[in-house]
Amino acid sequence: MLRSHPTRRALAILLLTAMGTPVRPALAQSSSSKALVEAAKTAGTVGEQADGYLGFVIPQDDPGLTAAVAEINTARARLYAETARRHGVSPEVAGVAAAKALFETKLRPGDYYRDATGVWRRK
C-alpha cells in the first residue's frame, strides 16, 4: 500500500513494540466510543487516514458518532505527541508511522482508508 521508508518504518516498529499496536492509542477512550466507531467502520462511514487519525468517508450528522471520532482522535493526538517527544520526531511523523503500520497490519478487508493523496480507498 504505502511504500516503505526506513525512518518511518523504524518509527512504526517502535510504536508497535513500545505501545502495543498503533490502533490502540486511545487507551482512555470509552467502550461506547470504540463500539460506535467500529460499527461505523463496518458500515463504511468512518475510516483510517494516512495521518493516523480517523476520518469520515461519508459526512455524518450523528452527534454521537462525531463525538466518538473526536474522542479517539484526541487520544491519538496525545499518544503521537508523547511518542514524538520520546523519539525526537514530530507528532505528524509519529501519526503517519502509526497509520502506515495500521494500514499494513490491522485493516480488515472492506475497511476504508484515506491514502496520502487524500483519496478514500477500500481494502
Residue ranges: model-predicted function:
Residues 1-4:
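N-terminal secretory signal peptides that target proteins for export/translocation
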Residues 6-16:
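N-terminal export leaders
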Residues 9-10, 25, 77:
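Hydrophobic alpha-helical segments, especially transmembrane helices
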Residues 22-28:
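Sec/Tat signal peptide C-region and signal peptidase I cleavage site
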Residues 24, 68-69:
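A generic structural signal for short
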Residues 30-67, 87, 91-123:
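Amphipathic, charged alpha-helical segments and their helix-to-coil junctions
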Residues 69-84:
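Short, well-ordered alpha-helical segments
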